[in-house]
Each structure stands twice: as C-alpha cells, then as structure tokens.
Amino acid sequence: MKLTVDDVRSRFVEHFDGTTGSVYSSPGRINLIGEHTDYNGGFVFPGAVTQGVIAEIKPNGTRKVRAYSIDLKDYVEFSLDDEKGPSATHFRFIFGVCREMMKLGVPVEGFNTAFAGDVPLGAGMSSSAALESTYAFALNDLFADNKIDKFTLAKVGQATEHNYIGCNCGIMDQFASVFGKAGSLMRLDCRSLEFKYFPFDPKGYKLVLLNSQVKHELASSAYNDRRKSCENVVAAMKRHWPNVDSLRDATYDMLDEVRPEVSEEDALRAKYVIGEKYRVLEVCVALEEGDYEEVGKKMYETHYGLSKEYEVSCPELDFLNDVAHSCGVTGSRIMGGGFGGCTINLVSDDLYANFIETAKKAYKEKFGKEPIVIDVVIGDGSRKLC
C-alpha cells in the first residue's frame, strides 16, 4: 500500500503533544542508464520515483530533536549541540543533516518529528537519500526561509553520508531526490554537475524492477578492482594525450592505441565505460524522439557490457535478463553496482503480465525463491505536502 500523509500524521499526533506540524516528502530513485560512469567523470540518467519518505516536523522551542521512526518503532532524543549524536543509523541521517545545515549558518532549532518510508530496502533505490533530502528540504523551509538552493541541499545529503554514516557516495542519489520531476529523467554530468531534464512518459510501457534478493559479498573489493582498471587505462592514455583526465575523455580509437600498454582485462573494462558514455547520449536522442524501442535496445547493450566486459553481473541477474529477452521485453539491464540487486525493465503493457508471471516462476525453479516485483513511476522531487 502507498504511504500517505495520514499514516505519518496519526503517529505524529499520537507520539507528541496532539498537535500537528508541517509535512515534507522526498523520493527514492532509479537510474535508467549510465552505470559505473560516475567515478569516470561520465553521465548518469536518474529519475525520482513515487516511493519515498514522508516526515512530519514541528519546532518544539528547545535545543532537542525528538524523532520517532514509524517503520522501526524506534524513538530517540538528541541535542543539536551534541558532537556525537545518536548511534542508530536511521537517526544519524537526521542528526547529520541538522549539523550540516548548521555549518551553512542555518539557525536550526529543536523539533519533534515522525517519519516513514515506502522505498523498498535492498533494491538500490536510495532510501537513505530520500531521508536526507526530506530533512534538508524541511529544515531549509522551517529555519532558513528557503534561502538554501537545491544544489546545496543535495550536497548536504552527500556530506551527511560522508561525515556521519561513513559512506563515500557520489551525488547522484541526493541530486535525483531533490531535483526529481514527474514525467522526466535527468542527465547529470558527473564532472561539471550540470544537468538537463529529458521527457520520460512511456505510454504503452511500464518500468519495473525485479529484485534478485541476492547480494554477493565480493562487491566492494570488485568495485575497487574495476576503479583501478579505469585508472590504469587513463594513465596509459595520459602519456599520449595529456588532457585525458578520465575515461569520459576517451574514445574507442584511443583505447585501441594504448591496448599494448594495458592488460586485456583493463582494456575490456575501459571499453565498457567508453561505450556507456555513448549509450547515454544515444538514449537522450531516443527519448527526445519518443523512441522507446531504441531506449530498450541500449539497455540490453548496457547489460551485456556490465556482464561480459565490466564483469559485475552474477548468474541471478543474467538469468533475469535472459528471461526478459525471451519474453520480448523492450529493455532490461542490471541497475546499480552489480553482483546482485535489481534488473530494471522497460516492458510493453501487453507483455507485462506474462513477463512477471514467467520471471517469477522460472526464477523460483532455478534459485528457490521469487524475485520481488517493484513497479516504478517517475515522480517529483523534494516538496512540502502540507
């Protein structure tokens, strides 16, 4: 069931003084294409979704924040002047946002708050960014008269991850959550942080995630290996072309020229990243022309590259991609870092029911459990609901 304002408001009234506050929301996100491109200075292509976090907030006239997690049935009090903050991660997000906003000179005061979310956990849809963005947006409204620009609010969320959670993330998740726009995806340039909206209104198609329910343990070490491969190829190119700073600057011809200087594994991984740069730009053109068949074709190409060139897939994800292809699904690929998580699928309305039924049955026969089906609609970014 869809999370509503009433769900949060009833718990807020119940846990605090019986009066109501202001209600804010921020979404999770998907990334249509542009995977493992962020740390290579390339493009990503996210969109906000209709699943997100809803929080009710009311200043309480003290220096204390009193927070209640509806989903976890957990409560905490912390002082805004405390250097350490609460230990529970879900409350550290709120604490971190408060501290980062205070660093910007926002006169944050104590408040009561209750919050809940319906972003599926473990699906790579950035529930944490939704939580951070909700509170950054709310504190800007309540204590700064909305003087902090959206770009800075996204960076507040990123800084919270870095400084209070210990996750050295990029900016995409928070950016998509704050800047999301219904009916549009964003092409975000990870080098300049410039972005542009592109129409995404696929009439006759649905966007659906299939969560494999697996996460293979080698993900973090494999991520570092691949990042090093990219750096190795850039170093080789830089000897020939000093202006090359990342694979964003590279072409296939340049890669061919330095192949004798790098390992075959490194070259193959660089080939994927270079190709993904072009695929994102090709998807931009396809969306402007309303050509969703071409979008789907590029999604399949990305999956092939992630599986066979960048080698971040796993049997479960390749199986789901194969099922999608055999069912005539328009487009399908790994979404996220790989080694588990979800596939993102663009499927025509007339094939949707058969695809879901076939995928669930075949996956259960092969792996002993069904994938979790998550229907996705592109929605708006951070906002005040009431």
Where are these regions (language model features)?
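C-terminal nucleotide
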Residues: 1-29, 54-87, 184-331, 346-386
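Gly/Ser-rich oxyanion-binding loop with an adjacent helix/lid
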Residues: 1-24, 30, 34, 39, ...
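Short Gly/aromatic-enriched secondary-structure transition segments
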Residues: 41-48, 226-227
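Short, charge-rich binding segments
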Residues: 46-48, 56-59, 105
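Glycine-rich phosphate-binding loop
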Residues: 339
